[in-house]
Amino acid sequence: MNPKFKIELLEDVNEFLNGLNEKAREKIIYNLRKSQVVNDNDLFKKLNDNVWEFRTLHNKTKYRLFAFWDKTDKTETVVISTHGIEKKTQKTPKKEIQKTEQIMKQ
């Protein structure tokens, strides 16, 4: 299957992924690729009008990569992932959503 969109990882995401153990990193990358071809809220979920999250559960740990749609290029659909966290609470921290919105404005 062809990907529905391209994913661009910013430096903060790469640093986050490099800080994880290999199995967790592999699972997140697998889920990123899978989210490009299937429509599944368990993998890629809208948080508000502008912010989305890539979701991964590995060994009872919830990982989130925050992202937004880049609509500047009319020929290609791109999702830009801004940063990642290990989610420790039920609700997504507002500061993480705000961080994504700030990066989006740059």
PLM features: residue spans?
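Basic, Lys/Arg-enriched alpha-helical interface segments
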Residues: 1-62, 71-79, 86-106
